[in-house]
From Swiss-Prot:
It is found in: Nucleus; Chromosome. Residues 334-350 form the Post-SET domain. The lineage of its organism: Eukaryota, Viridiplantae, Streptophyta, Embryophyta, Tracheophyta. Its EC number is 2.1.1.-. Residues 143-188 form the Pre-SET domain. Zn(2+) 4 binds at residues 284, 338, 340, 345. It holds the Pfam family SET. Belongs to the class V-like SAM-binding methyltransferase superfamily. This is Histone-lysine N-methyltransferase SUVR3. PROSITE patterns: POST_SET (PS50868), SET (PS50280). One of its GO terms (cellular component) is nucleus. SMART domains: AWS, SET. It comes from Arabidopsis thaliana. In the pre-SET domain, Cys residues bind 3 zinc ions that are arranged in a triangular cluster; some of these Cys residues contribute to the binding of two zinc ions within the cluster. Histone methyltransferase.
Length: 354
């Protein structure tokens, strides 16, 4: 009769052995890599002080964030450069286009290591960076332009050279599709840019390549506000500016009738949610950018788009004129100092009561 082989007694395992520690550490790292990219800089700094591992992850995140302000939402990475102080990047929620205003607090956005696909395990989606997204509102009439092809005589949309003050583009319904040559501004940033820290002006947007006259730079993206909400926020921003170092990015744009009378007011706030245009500074000489109020066929509202007003060389700061309206009153304390450095600098930034 064959004798059954006796099984060896089970080995006693002690807590803390490598087989227990490694899976636990792996789970810890995976959780950290999923959670930390949602944190803002202040929260990240607090977490970094808790242990060496989280400190290393936080430092890695800081490096990744400084490499691309656009969080892979544009065609090209837009890095931060700072040789002035220890601030590696400016924190805000990125959107490539206009979105309806969000209620406070602002939504969070993943900002971690670059990923090619939204929805992957390493990069959760942020659904407010779509023209409908979580707001359930579309700013575009999907019917768009019905032209057969974008050529003179076939398309009613105006093809332009980036020098007009008001112009039109084909919309999403164009028969040419997304490759239409008259939908330049709808394809996002396509020139190399970088964000540089200046001792006087703070963050500035610079060209990182030669940009030819008439080339599209970017649109001014942010939250679309009602006039009442714009006034409410501006009051808050003014109070913050009086007590601390604070810079807002609330821009008021007016579309005028041929008679010169304003017919449409658009309030775009890029302070909390915006794109790289929030870093474009004022220049009293008009700067090197031209602004175009551009309507895409079928769109409900125009967009403020920036084009090169002349050839712009690499390492040149991008700037435009904020306007000619000055704050009412003689109190200079109510005005913001201008540091544009142009020969015709007026010393204060153009602004108006919203």
């Amino acid at each position: 009769m064959q004798r059954l082989r006796e099984s060896p007694p089970p080995k006693t395992r002690c807590l803390g052995e490598a087989s227990d520690i490694i899976p636990a550490a792996d789970r810890f790292l995976r959780c950290a890599n999923l959670i930390l990219p949602w944190l803002n800089p202040r929260e990240l700094a607090v977490v970094a002080q808790t242990c060496k591992t989280l400190s290393l992850i936080s430092k890695s995140l800081t490096i990744h964030r400084s490499l691309d302000a656009a969080r892979s939402l544009e065609n090209i990475s837009i890095p931060f450069h700072n040789s002035i102080d220890s601030q590696r990047y400016a924190y805000f929620i990125y959107t490539p286009f206009q979105i309806p205003a969000s209620s406070p607090p602002p939504p969070r956005q993943w900002w971690g290591a670059a990923a090619n696909e939204c929805g992957s395990e390493s990069r959760p989606c942020f659904d407010s960076v779509s023209e409908s997204g979580r707001f359930g509102v579309s700013l575009v009439d999907e019917s768009g332009c019905e032209c057969e092809r974008c050529e003179e005589g076939y398309c009613k949309c105006l093809a332009f050279a980036g020098m007009e003050e008001i112009a039109n583009e084909c919309g999403s319904g164009c028969g040419c599709g997304s490759d239409c040559s008259n939908r330049v501004t709808q394809k996002g940033v396509s020139v190399s840019l970088k964000i540089v820290r200046d001792e006087k002006k703070g963050w500035c947007l610079y060209a990182d390549q030669l940009i030819k006259q008439g080339q599209f730079i970017c649109e001014y993206a942010g939250e679309l506000l009602t006039t009442d909400e714009a006034r409410r926020r501006q009051n808050i921003y003014d109070k913050l500016r009086s007590t601390q170092s604070f810079a807002s990015a609330l821009l008021v744009v007016r579309e005028h009738l041929p008679s010169g009378q304003a017919c449409l007011r658009i309030n775009i706030d890029a302070t909390r949610i915006g794109n790289v245009a929030r870093f474009i500074n004022h220049s009293c000489d008009g700067g090197n950018l031209s602004t175009v109020l551009l309507r895409s066929s079928g769109a409900l509202l125009p967009r403020l788009c920036f084009f090169a007003a002349k050839d712009i060389i690499a390492e040149e700061e991008l700037s435009f004129s904020y306007g000619d309206v000055s704050v009412a009153g003689e109190n200079r304390d109510d005005k913001l100092n201008c540091s544009c450095g142009s020969s015709c600098c007026l010393g204060t930034l153009p602004c108006e009561n919203t």
